[in-house]
Design a protein with these regions (language model features):
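Phosphate/diphosphate ligand-binding glycine-rich loop within oxidoreductases
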Residues: 2-117
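Glycine-rich adenosine-cofactor-binding loop
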Residues: 8, 103-106, 113, 117-140
């Protein structure tokens, strides 16, 4: 069974575990999704190594920017935004770990806002300075 999850702090507000449990069951996917309430991510690679079934995880507040420096590769979107909300865990045949960072906030925002924008829309007030707001800045 593969394991996926969410890292962040605090996670009491998150509905991800329930959502993915239902999704995996409906799609007959042999996987589980767990919330990992991590106060800090300073030793991310070691933490991933302690979870041998972990194939990937989502990243939420306050770690979207902090994880960037600990990843092996970044997608073009993650590089442009400077924040990551999806990490793919690749376990190489020689035993090494590769952590690939992605940002789906940018695509999610731009696809959802595009139908609502008109040429007269030239300014926006963005509240926040975290990883998601950075994606909004890039998206606009």
């Amino acid at each position: 069974m593969r394991q996926y999850g969410l890292i962040g702090h605090p996670l009491g507000h998150s509905f991800s575990a329930a959502f993915f449990a239902q999704k995996f069951a409906c799609e007959n996917i042999d996987a589980q999704y767990d919330n990992f309430d991590l106060v800090e991510v300073g030793n991310l690679r070691n933490w991933v190594g302690e979870h041998p079934l972990l194939a990937g995880f989502n990243v939420t507040i306050p770690h979207k920017q902090a994880v960037v420096s600990q990843l092996d590769t970044l997608s073009p979107e993650a590089t442009e935004v400077g924040a990551v909300n999806v990490v793919r865990v690749v376990r190489e045949s020689n035993g090494t770990l590769r952590l690939d960072g992605h940002n789906s906030d940018l695509l999610g925002f731009t696809r959802s806002i595009a139908p609502l924008l008109c040429p007269i829309h030239r300014k926006a007030l963005i509240l926040g300075t975290g990883g998601a707001s950075k994606a909004v800045v890039v998206g606009l």
